[in-house]
């Protein structure tokens, strides 16, 4: 199943934000799937066209602090958005932001982000019923308990899992994070939670690992809190990426299969990605396909329900990564119908 709701907008330009996240990532992928000679005529078998889930303040409070959630629902919201999306630099100047070009108030961005969280929750529910689901949007893995970071205001991954746990739909889960950047927020939020196991394969250097690991008081930088399984990939190690990932996945086997796996299928490791901070990892389209097929079969062969979210992907070519995997996965799933 694929969740594609036309009301979910990915782009940021309406808010005057110049980060290269585009509506076209989901739209171009969907249009090509709709026109596919095999998948197009069977669209009613794989498309969910409406996000019907709702996410409440209570859902956020299972993951984020009362103080932080309170700021998101107050007149402090705009300040939190500016900080999370890094719209003002150290000198107090606008950075990747021109409010004069905005057609929507900045605070409406929070509503859009909550809609993404709802999509992630719905994707997880459908994965439990249908074994596989892919949702456009989601994967906000940098948000931590008390603050947002790296364009992520709330951590939809952990919000979704804790919501399903509260409803007794799942007990255990894996988070397999394929984004170019380390899933630091998810690692921090789940480090004392044995019910959620995290794996992150990411750039060994660069944001969010570009600071000091410890502050002057000897406290660990939250971005350096380890996932249960971390797979750092160094500059020039692209040829080792798939083998490193396979070795990391095999470590999960000894833990025992979870009730659900969430996969952050980031397209930002792509060599054509346009966000400067992804430049330490440049995978080809073929390498990304090998990545995605490896993870898919690893989970499917163990009978683990799998919910996919898009996570990072920047610029005009991000959709290419999504399309090649979704086309392949849908054709695989339609074999059973």
Question: Language-model segments: what does each one mean?
Answer:
Residues 1-337:
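HDAC/HDAC-like amidohydrolase catalytic core signature
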């Amino acid at each position: 199943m694929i969740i594609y709701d036309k009301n979910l907008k990915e782009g940021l330009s309406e808010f005057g934000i110049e980060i290269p996240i585009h509506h076209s990532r989901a739209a171009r992928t969907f249009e090509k799937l709709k026109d596919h000679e095999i998948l197009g005529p069977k669209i009613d078998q794989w498309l969910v066209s409406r996000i019907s889930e709702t996410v409440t303040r209570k859902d956020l409070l299972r993951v984020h602090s009362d103080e932080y959630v309170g700021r998101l629902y107050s007149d402090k919201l705009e300040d939190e958005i500016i900080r999370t999306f890094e719209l003002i630099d150290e000198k107090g100047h606008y950075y990747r932001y021109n409010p004069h070009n905005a057609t929507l108030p900045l605070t409406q961005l929070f509503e859009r982000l909550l809609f993404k969280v709802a999509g992630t929750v719905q994707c997880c529910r459908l994965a439990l019923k249908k074994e596989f689901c892919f949702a456009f949007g989601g994967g906000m893995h940098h948000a931590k308990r008390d603050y947002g970071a790296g364009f992520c205001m709330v951590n939809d991954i952990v919000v979704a899992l804790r919501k399903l746990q509260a409803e007794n739909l799942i007990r255990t889960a894996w988070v397999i994070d394929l984004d170019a950047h380390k899933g630091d927020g998810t690692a921090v939020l789940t480090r004392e939670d044995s019910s959620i196991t995290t794996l992150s394969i990411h750039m060994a250097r660069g944001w969010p690992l570009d600071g000091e690991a410890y502050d002057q008081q000897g406290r660990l930088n939250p971005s350096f809190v380890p996932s249960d399984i971390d797979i750092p990939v160094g500059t020039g190690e692209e040829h080792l990426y798939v083998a490193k990932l396979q070795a990391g996945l095999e470590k999960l086997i000894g833990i025992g299969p979870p009730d659900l796996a969430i996969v952050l299928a980031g397209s930002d490791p792509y060599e054509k990605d346009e966000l400067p901070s992804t430049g330490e990892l440049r995978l080809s389209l073929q390498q990304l396909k090998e990545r995605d097929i490896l993870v898919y079969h690893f989970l499917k062969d163990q009978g683990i329900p799998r919910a996919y979210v898009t996570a990072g992907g920047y610029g005009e070519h991000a959709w290419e990564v999504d399309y090649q995997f979704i086309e392949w996965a849908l054709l695989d799933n339609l074999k059973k119908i």
